[in-house]
A protein has these predicted regions:
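Conserved acidic carboxylate
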Residues: 15, 63
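Charged docking surfaces used in two-component/phosphorelay signaling
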Residues: 22-30
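Acidic, metal-coordinating helix/loop segments flanking the phosphotransfer/catalytic sites
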Residues: 37-56
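The short loop immediately C-terminal to the conserved phospho-acceptor aspartate in CheY-like receiver
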Residues: 57, 61-62, 90
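The feature encodes the CheY-like receiver
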Residues: 64, 92, 110
């Protein structure tokens, strides 16, 4: 279903692997989302400052520089309303608990389907 400009939800995708980031971005755009891309945690935080109306942030955990857990903490310190979804290959229970305790609303492990991703972002 295509969205009108008024309905379009802005989503930040933080993923350092370009092929995975492209897969996520293509599928979200096909679903009608306005997507902002970031390759590092620092870049993601800067893009969120530039785009304060972002509704959802998809965060990988394993990144160069600051990791996704720290990005999540920093986002939550300044924005309690944005939806945060950890999107990672790390599937251990402790990682999931850490993600949720740092402020994530959801935790999705790779691999995932485009349909699952879109359903969680909605």
């Amino acid at each position: 279903m295509e969205r009108t400009d008024i309905q379009m939800k802005k989503v930040l995708v933080l993923e350092d692997e370009s092929s995975i980031r492209s897969f996520i971005v293509i599928n979200l755009r096909r679903a009608g989302y306005d997507v902002i891309e970031a390759e590092t945690g620092e870049e993601a935080l800067e893009k969120l400052k530039e785009n304060p109306n972002t509704k959802v942030a998809l965060l990988d955990i394993m990144l160069p520089g600051i990791d996704g857990f720290e990005v999540c903490r920093r986002i939550r310190a300044t924005n309690s309303k944005i939806g945060i979804i950890m999107l990672t290959a790390r599937s251990q229970e402790m990682d999931k608990v850490t993600g949720l305790m740092t402020g994530a609303d959801d935790y999705v492990t790779k691999p995932f389907s485009p349909a699952e991703l879109t359903a969680r972002v909605d």
